Structures are given as C-alpha cells and as structure tokens.
Regions:
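Hydrophobic/aromatic beta-strand patches that form the interior of the parallel beta-sheet core
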Residues: 53, 82-84, 112, 187, ...
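Class I S-adenosyl-L-methionine
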Residues: 1-75, 82-100, 120, 143, ...
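Polybasic, glycine- and aromatic-enriched phosphate-binding surface used to engage nucleic acids
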Residues: 293-487
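Signature of N6-adenine DNA methyltransferases within the class I
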Residues: 22-23, 27-36, 57-64, 78, ...
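Short helix-terminating capping/connector loops at secondary-structure junctions
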Residues: 45-49, 73-78, 104-107, 131-134, ...
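Conserved SAM-binding strand-loop segment of SAM-dependent methyltransferases
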Residues: 106-116
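Conserved acidic residues
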Residues: 50, 137, 373
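Short, flexible turn/loop "capping" segments at secondary-structure junctions
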Residues: 74, 230, 404-405
C-alpha cells in the first residue's frame, strides 16, 4: 500500500516545480520516515472505531502509513480518516490514493479542500459539543513550513499562540492539539525552532497547558528527512498526548541514516526535557543529560543579575550613509565593531582595515557608551566547533572615544566590574555552556533571549571566577578549569 502511494508522490514531485510547492510550504515525507512516525502511536486496538486526521495531507503518505500500521497490528474496527489539502494539483492524487486504501482496508475517508485553520473554532471556552465533529483519536502530520504575515487570516484566527509573524507549522500543531480527544495522540514532524525563545513562547504555553511530550526523534543529519526535497531545516518527530499527566520519562531517539538503521534510544526524565520556563531540551546521551542537570541546578540568570545580553545596534546595510572606512579629522567618528573583530583567543582586534569600521552619527540609538563588554557572535557556521564565540572588549584600550557601536550580527553584555566581566566570559567561553546552548538551540544563531534565560551562578561566584581568569589567557581550557571548580 505504502509503496504504491509513494510512487505516485515521486511522480508528482518530478513534475511539480519546487517553487510552486514552496508557496504552500510543501515538502513530502519519505516512506521510511512515514513508517517510523506511524509506529510511534500506541493505538487502542479495542476501540470499535478510530478517527484519524491528517491535515496538510499532500498525497497521503502519512495517512497510508498510519492505516497500514493499524492493519499490521491486527486492528479489526472501522477507521474514519479525514484529510485536509488545499493544493488543487495534489488533491486528485490524494483522492486516488485514499480510494486505493479504501479498497484494501476497513476505511472511510473525507477530503476537505478548505482552510484547516480558519474553518473551525479555536478557543478554550468553545463548547465541547460544538467541537465534536472536529475531534480525533489520532493525528499524524507534516504541517506546512511557511512564514505568514501577522495579519494573515490564520494568525488573526489564533491570537492565543501568535507572537509577531507566525509560521504555519505551529498554527497547524496548535489546532491539532485542539482537535485531539482527551488522551488522544499526535505525531508530527516539525522544525526544532519551537523549543526555545520568545517567538514560540505562547505556543509552548498552549502546548503544555493541554498536552505532554511522550517521545521525540532527532535527525542527526538534516538531509535524511525529506530524501527527495533538499531540505536543510533541522527537524524532529514529536509524539504528544492530550493529557496533563506527565510521564516520568520521555523516550528520545536519534538516527543519522535515512532508513533508521542506526537508531538509538535514550530515556530522559520529563523535568530534564521540559524546563520550568517551558523551554525544551533534547539531550541524546548521558553526558548531555549531565550538562543539563549541572546548569539547570543554578537559579540566577544574566537578566536577574542585571547584566543582560543585547543585540548589536547597527544594521549596516540600512545605515550606509553614516559608515566610514577610516577616521576623518574634520568630523567625529566612533569605532563600529563586527563579528570579524572577535578573535579566536578571546581578544577584540580593531581596526583590521575592513570597510565601515567607523560610524559618524549623533543618533542615540546607534551609539553606546565606551564601557567594558563581552562581544558574542550571533551567527556561526554548522561546521564550527563552538556555538558561543566571544571576546572581551576593554574600554581602556580605546580611551579617546566616548562612544562605540556594534553591528547587529554580534551580541553584547556590559559589565561595570572587571571581575564580573571576566567571570561571565569564563562561563560563556566554557565547554559546559557551549554544550548547554547547543542542546537548547539546534540552530547556528545565538539568540539573546535564550542566553539571558540560561541559569548561571550568583554574582559573588561569577566575580570570584573572573578574578581567577583576569590576567590569564582567555582560552576555553582556562575557562573550563575555572568553571569545573565552581559549578
């Protein structure tokens, strides 16, 4: 069954231009991934009828995998399948595939070509009786990955989970939680980006108000998920259950091959994965779980200690008229720091002869006091060994300037005390915190909101750490020695 449907899907992909599919956020799941997702369900085989939903069904690969899994497990009841799909090019293929499934299984099906989000209610106070036709026992999905404007109909329909311009994938996910019967299960393949940060905060609050995570699968290699699609977005499979009763542990599995042949499983305490602030951590081994345990035992943050990280002030391509390549004697210019000024030994090296290293402006929003800072690169490549790459900026090295500025591809932390400055640097430049951030955030971007939320020691301890580092090489090795002593 699955292979026949897969072949029709491959034929469609070969004919449909990728740009057309990208307009829908449309990427098709591989057969092995679909099979793995379907086997994650704990189907109740005693139910006389099962209601199954696949929103954004595409050609029906995931629906077929779920139905086939039920048949393989010996389910003898009736399967009622509902599929949403709005792409008129793919709907005829979907209907053909569902009819094929109908001939081989005890199955009824409906294909809805309406908008999955806007055609049904979404609110905690909606009468359950009014929602009965939108309730399902099991939901499987590969939701569309597409950023939409904050005033798009879908965003306006679901303000409870939106912050700024949302992505359709988590609106589909939130609506699917709304669609689940109590104790129902959902298995979705989604990007990893939802696990942290302010952008997804409302969604995470909604998720954990209504459901709990049961299992997670991580793809070590990003190009193995959508085998014919050249997708490099970091993705995961997640299984949730509509219940507020938390399991003791979450099963986290991982694989680096397209056929899941090197599958590993790891049981992690629920409270290690889901933090009190609803950030989600996804360790894949005991070492990473140990990192989380050590850091999450601390209670302060950069924010509580009033040394928050901020993003650099200048978007250089928007401010070209105030950028200068060199100092000009007749006007007042100030240093403008870029990520390229952060050296590998933790020093700030400026100027280096690049264009736009000076700024001439009196606009307060583009200038900051010439104080002591830690500069942190906002972007690193996937191949680089460290995600947190920082340098110590000392105002005493540039005494003639009252102000400086920072390009928005770096983050900065201002510290009045030198001991505090070096102590915070020791934390961020340590292996422990680099590992912690990598577990928290799978992307290559260093987000100030997430760094500000990372647990750190109290100010007195950080100052003592800084006193130990002051005057020493600013290497990770030295930082590790100090951090190991205090944390």
């Amino acid at each position: 069954m699955l292979q026949a449907i897969l072949q029709r899907t491959k034929d469609f992909i070969a004919k449909a231009p990728k740009e057309d599919r990208k307009r829908y956020g449309q990427f098709f799941t591989s057969d092995r991934t679909a099979e793995y997702m379907a086997q994650m369900f704990h189907f109740d085989l005693s139910k006389p009828e099962i209601k199954l939903l696949d929103a954004g069904a595409g050609t029906g690969i995931l629906s077929a995998a779920a139905v086939w899994s039920l048949m393989q497990r010996g389910y003898e009841g009736k399967i009622h399948l509902v599929c949403y799909e709005t792409d008129t090019h793919v709907v005829p293929i979907l209907i053909d595939n569902l009819e094929y499934m109908h001939q081989h299984a005890n199955l009824t099906y409906r294909v809805l070509t309406e908008n999955y989000i806007t055609t049904q209610p979404f609110a905690d106070n909606v009468n359950l009786f009014d929602l009965r036709e939108y309730r399902y026992d099991y939901i499987i999905g590969n939701p569309p990955y597409l950023k939409i404007p904050k005033d798009a109909p879908e965003a306006l329909h679901m303000p409870q989970v939106c912050y700024g311009a949302p992505n359709l994938y988590f609106l589909f996910w939130a609506m699917a939680i709304n669609n689940l019967n109590e104790d129902g299960e959902l298995v979705y393949i989604v990007p990893r980006s939802w696990t942290s940060g302010a952008y997804f905060e409302r969604f995470r609050e909604y998720l954990f108000k209504h459901a709990t995570i049961q299992a997670v699968h991580l793809f070590v290699s990003r190009d193995k998920v959508f085998s014919d699609e050249s997708v490099l977005q970091e993705t995961m499979i997640i299984k949730i259950k509509k219940t507020t009763k938390q399991p003791e542990t979450i099963d986290i599995s991982s694989s680096s091959t397209a056929d899941f042949s090197d599958l590993t499983h790891f049981q992690v305490p629920y409270t290690t994965v889901v933090a009190h602030n609803h950030y989600v951590f996804l360790p894949t081994n005991n070492e990473e779980a140990g990192v989380l345990a050590r850091v999450n035992a601390l209670s302060d943050t950069l924010k509580t200690l009033q040394v928050p990280m901020h993003t650099g002030l200048v978007v250089d391509f928007r401010e070209r008229e105030v950028l200068k390549d060199e100092e000009e004697p007749e006007i007042e210019t100030y240093p403008l720091f870029y990520s390229s000024h952060i050296s590998k030994d933790g020093q700030i090296v400026w100027p280096v002869g690049k264009s736009g290293e000076y700024i001439h402006t009196d606009r307060a929003g583009l200038l900051q006091s010439n104080s002591n800072y830690i500069f942190v690169k906002r972007f690193t490549s996937k191949e680089e060994p460290r995600r947190l790459q920082c340098g110590v900026y000392l105002s005493s090295r540039y005494p003639k300037y009252k102000y400086i500025s920072t390009q928005n591809k770096i983050n900065f932390i201002e510290c009045k005390s030198l001991d505090m400055l070096y102590g915070v640097y020791a934390l961020l430049n340590s292996t422990l915190y680099d590992q912690y951030y990598r577990i928290l955030n799978g992307s290559t971007q260093v987000n100030s909101t997430e760094v500000n939320a990372m647990p750190i020691p109290p100010a007195s301890t950080i100052s003592k750490m800084g006193a130990e580092l002051s005057g020493k090489p600013l290497t990770t090795a030295y930082c590790d020695q100090i951090v190991e002593k205090w944390i």
